Amino acid sequence: MGEIRKPIKKSSIEKKNKILEKGFTLMCEKGYHNVNCVDIAKYAGVSTGIIYQYFTDKRDIFIEGVKNYSSKIMFPMIDILDNTKIDKNNLEKILNSMIDSFINTHKMSKKAHEELISMSHIDDEINQIFKDNELKINEKIVNTLKYNNFNVKNLNEKVHIIIGLIDNFCHEIVYHAHKSLNYDEMKKEVINIVLYLLKD
């Protein structure tokens, strides 16, 4: 196997990114263990040899994919925080939007989400990337709230609880779907808990 090269030319960078995007998507859709580099090459429209110019193996592609795309799949609410001024008067509305975004992304990326979680349980490096991303997201939300004058005691810990609460609610809707539960009412309860946690 030849030496792994770092692309410099624009065309080479685009080719590597295409392999990364297509390969990661394919492994998320079909399952990591059901895909090989030949499958990825075919899906990306390149030769297998080209793949080995940029990546060691399919795990290398998956790891890079996790680093580049997992936050968008797992934490879509960040886009809303980046583009919205938050204050105590519009917090409830923003929470509604964040939860809806989280649910929709879980539904659209259901297979990818499942595969990422599955791989995080069996691969220490992927698990560590998730842990690091989780802390970065937590820190970003805390800093955003502080910037918008949410001066709450134990804010770091409360934000961690809030992320877990919203994530659990989304999983309930997307994966469990208990017919005996009213999800509109549950959503209201989730928002009420978050509002309570963020009170001065």
Language-model features: where?
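Hydrophobic/aromatic-rich alpha-helical bundle segments in the mid-to-C-terminal region
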Residues: 114-116, 147-193
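Alpha-helical DNA-contacting segments of helix-turn-helix folds
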Residues: 63-69, 129, 133
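N-terminal intrinsically disordered/low-complexity leader segments
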Residues: 1-14
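Hydrophobic alpha-helical bundle segments that form small-molecule/ligand-binding pockets
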Residues: 84, 121-124, 134-159, 200
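Hydrophobic alpha-helical connector segments
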Residues: 64, 79-108, 149-152, 162
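Helix-turn-helix
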Residues: 14, 18, 22, 26-60, ...
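Short secondary-structure transition hinges
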Residues: 107-137
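Short, basic, alpha-helical segments at the C-terminal edge of helix-turn-helix-like DNA-binding modules
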Residues: 37, 67-73
